[in-house]
UniProtKB/Swiss-Prot annotation:
Protein's name in the database: Aquaporin Lacbi1:233199
Cytoplasmic side: 1-17, 66-88, 165-174, 249-263
Chain location of the short sequence motif NPA 1 per the record: 71-73
Ranges spanned by the short sequence motif NPA 2, renumbered to the chain: 201-203
Gene Ontology MF terms: glycerol channel activity; water channel activity
Similarity remark: Belongs to the MIP/aquaporin (TC 1.A.8) family.
Membrane-spanning segments: 18-38, 45-65, 89-109, 144-164, 175-195, 228-248
Compartment list: Membrane
Gene3D superfamilies named among the record's database cross-references: Glycerol uptake facilitator protein
One GO term describing the cellular component: plasma membrane
């Protein structure tokens, strides 16, 4: 007989991923809204801090339960390089995307009146406020440059995540890992974040983008730059994380759980 405790145990890991991504988006998109929609001068650093705090809080709430992936690209990389069960990948990714949807919905509900004022009315919704939740590239960026920017930043992210979980390479304790991720995201945003708003995470972009579609932002969300939403913030991070994992395990990792074994 299945008990409530059994069902709770069955969904505990996906729910940790759900709340982790929801917190990531609440802090990150919330910071973007507060900076852009206020009368204060825009500050990319403030937005950068918001996303960095979000990744740290998301990792803290989920790390000891689900591993704190809070990113489909990292989940797939962990399945490829660290033996994470492939059968759990779909439930993790679904939970991560839904967390992005709910996180964006909560931020939108909190700032809806400010968005109305900024846009000039309740039924006016443009890319100017969509970009507070989903990622868009700067106008001068080519398609190849957009892809490479997301690929490169996610490769660095994946390499560092594998380093932070490598007990043979001075990995921090569980309590310090979120702080290390905070520092990592500050660095990634400061160095590689300007041109594409550094999604690095399919759930962080696709979840909020799905919510925006439900909120009335229209087809432009998905028609922008020939389906930018698919190849830049989804495909590029997934491939970038695979590349980062390949580099780390080929040249640095000495464990037995990698498919790349030198012994």
């Amino acid at each position: 007989m299945f008990t409530l405790a059994h069902h709770r145990h069955a969904i505990r890991k996906p729910m940790a991923e759900f709340f982790g991504v929801a917190l990531l988006v609440i802090f990150g998109a919330g910071a973007a809204c507060q900076v852009v929609l206020s009368t204060n001068p825009n500050s990319f650093l403030s937005i950068n801090f918001g996303w960095a705090i979000g990744i740290a809080m998301g990792a803290w709430i989920s790390g000891s339960i689900s591993g704190g992936h809070i990113n489909p690209a990292i989940t797939i990389a962990m399945a490829t390089y660290r033996g994470f069960p492939w059968r759990e990948v779909p439930s993790y990714i679904l939970a991560q995307v839904l967390g992005g949807v709910v996180g964006a919905a909560l931020v939108y509900a909190n700032y809806i009146h400010a968005i109305d004022v900024f846009e000039g009315g309740r039924h006016i919704r443009t890319q100017a406020t969509a970009s507070l939740f989903a990622t868009y590239a700067l106008p001068y960026m080519t398609q190849v440059s957009c892809f490479f920017s997301e690929f490169l930043a996610t490769a660095v992210l994946a390499m560092m995540v594998l380093a932070l979980t490598d007990n043979r390479n001075g990995a921090p304790t569980n309590g310090l890992s979120p702080f290390a991720l905070f520092v990592l995201f500050i660095g990634l945003g400061a160095s590689l974040g300007m041109e594409t708003a550094y999604a690095l995470n399919p759930a962080r972009d696709f979840g909020p983008r799905l919510f925006l579609a439900m909120a009335g932002y229209g087809k432009a969300l998905f028609n922008y730059r020939s389906q930018y939403w698919l190849w830049a913030p989804i495909i590029a991070p997934v491939l970038g994380a695979q590349a980062g994992g390949l580099l780390y395990d080929t040249f640095l990792y000495d464990g037995d759980d990698s498919p790349i074994k030198w012994r």
